[in-house]
Amino acid sequence: MAIITGREIKDGELIILGVGLSMLAGYFAQFNHAPNLRPFTEGGVYGSTPVGGLPWGIECNRISANATSFTNAIDALGFLVLSGRADNAVIGAAQVDKYGNVNTTGIWDEPPWKTGRYTPPKVRLNGSGGASDISVGCKRYLIMASHEKRRFKERVDYISSVGYLTGGDSREKCEFIGGGPAAIISTLGILRPDPQTKEFYLEAYYPFTTIDEVKENTEWDLKISPDVKMVPEPTKKELKNLRAVDTTGSLRKKG
């Protein structure tokens, strides 16, 4: 999943990365095909190449040691992201719906949109962190998620980070600076938003799965591209560069 996400990242992009799989995908791209990538973190560490293994935090010494600059979250999120300067980002999702809205706030028996009032969730999650700012400010962003029916929802319990809201032009009406999610890269395949409806459809699936399995693990009626294809397997070069970032294999089993 990290390699497939990394393939979506272009050389020269100004990209904000979070901890874990987000950094793995981003720095993999830098090592593999995007040497001029301009990565930065929510903590304000800009222009670094990781040393000593996968970074464990947004300000850790593995990225701060050779950074071009070291500022703060206000500069990262307030200046680079919410001004519309950031080209791309990678965020995670506990739940994602058919319009790319992401929930990382909590899980409810009866979600607030159904009851009409906010009540404490049954399960409290970590929250959006900088992903809420990213979702409204970045020119585009990528969502990484484990593909399970309980996660790929018809409608998320709570919108922590906005996608295309209710579809169509509903996002444009809010006049956000950013352009919205460009893709959902899951553990089963790649989903893209329809240009008109903004509903996510299946563009490609992995060699080890099937279209039926992807549909069975999606709560909404997932549409399939007429040109649906199989995702090419990682090359030897890609695997080598992935392991050059995550030298200890700390996240290898997760993506």
What residue ranges belong to the model's regions?
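N-terminal active-site beta-alpha-beta segment that forms phosphate/nucleotide-binding
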Residues: M1-A67
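Feature targets compositionally biased, intrinsically disordered low-complexity regions
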Residues: G43, V51-G52, S83, T248, ...
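Acidic/aromatic/glycine-rich contiguous surface patches that form carbohydrate-binding/processing clefts
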Residues: D227-G255
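Short amphipathic alpha-helical patches
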Residues: F28-N32, G52-G53, T104, D109, ...
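Short, intrinsically disordered/low-complexity patches at protein termini
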Residues: A34, F40-T41, I224, D246-G249
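Residues that form generic nucleotide/phosphate-binding pockets
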Residues: E8, N217, N241, V245
